[in-house]
């Protein structure tokens, strides 16, 4: 089971006041990661961290900008979710998709601890697609940002009809919210992942 969570913001969302001008009471959010020592986990696209055997991988560009983040279960060797932001600038189409003919199309994640992944690509030849969680099409504004989406840590195995059907349709729909909204909505905060808590829900 794969899931999607999205939120959006506009320029008035962080005013901290109600429509009457009175300061609103801050409610303690049980899903907050503010006690976590990693600043990236405080960003709005992050869900509550699972913790335990999971680790956080945050991919940055050479500019220092965060491209996307992953919660990875080291014992199950599986992605729990990938979260990222899309806005007008980072969905620009400046470079083509990484070629299908690239001999290293799905590289191992350089941020992985040595014991965190398989020693081979478990999806190649399995009958499943390499299903992007942060889509390649959402990261065509630079060669570096697009190439990072092909790391195996950003994949979940998907049946082709699903990956090329409803999943791709959903990805396209998310992009239209930014391109159509223009200045009324400036950012979408997206988190997508699969269910891996029960045996049989992840590859071994």
Task: List PLM regions with ranges.
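C-terminal motif of bacterial Sec signal peptides marking the signal peptidase cleavage site
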Residues: 5-9
């Amino acid at each position: 089971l794969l899931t999607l969570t999205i939120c959006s913001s506009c320029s008035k969302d962080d005013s901290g006041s109600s429509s009457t001008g009175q300061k609103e009471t801050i409610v303690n959010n049980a899903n907050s990661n503010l006690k976590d020592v990693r600043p990236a986990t405080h960003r709005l696209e992050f869900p509550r961290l699972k913790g335990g055997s999971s680790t956080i991988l945050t991919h940055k560009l050479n500019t220092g900008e965060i491209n996307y983040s992953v919660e990875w279960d080291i014992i199950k060797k599986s992605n729990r979710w990938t979260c990222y932001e899309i806005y007008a600038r980072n969905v620009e189409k400046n470079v083509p998709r990484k070629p299908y003919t690239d001999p290293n199309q799905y590289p191992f994640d350089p941020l992985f601890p040595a014991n965190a992944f398989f020693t081979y690509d478990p999806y190649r030849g399995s009958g499943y697609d390499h299903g992007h969680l942060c889509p390649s099409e959402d990261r065509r504004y630079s060669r570096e940002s697009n190439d990072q989406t092909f790391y195996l840590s950003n994949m979940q195995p998907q049946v082709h009809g699903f990956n090329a059907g409803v999943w791709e349709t959903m990805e396209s729909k998310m992009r239209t919210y930014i391109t159509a909204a223009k200045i009324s909505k400036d950012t979408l905060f997206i988190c997508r992942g699969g269910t891996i808590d029960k045996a049989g829900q992840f590859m071994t």
